């Protein structure tokens, strides 16, 4: 299994710079993105998409692209002061 973590520092700008081609080249099973800041549409038919965006538009946010469906998905820690920033997604696999 290949897992990649990428701080994209704004997914919309990263997408314009070839994000999708880079993801294809990496051939990762799971791609974890931080600081996505937006929910710009991604055409990734080979990946399931799990988004956790901040309540404040244009701020923080995370995205996980996964080739296999997880057993469970957790968004946040259950602490409102932290979860409003969209900083955590946990996927659980067997």
Could you tell me what each predicted segment is?
Residues 1-44, 54-59, 75:
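N-terminal, active-site-proximal structural segment of metallo-dependent hydrolase catalytic domains
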Residues 37, 42-94:
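Structured beta-strand-rich core segments of catalytic domains in phosphoester-bond hydrolases
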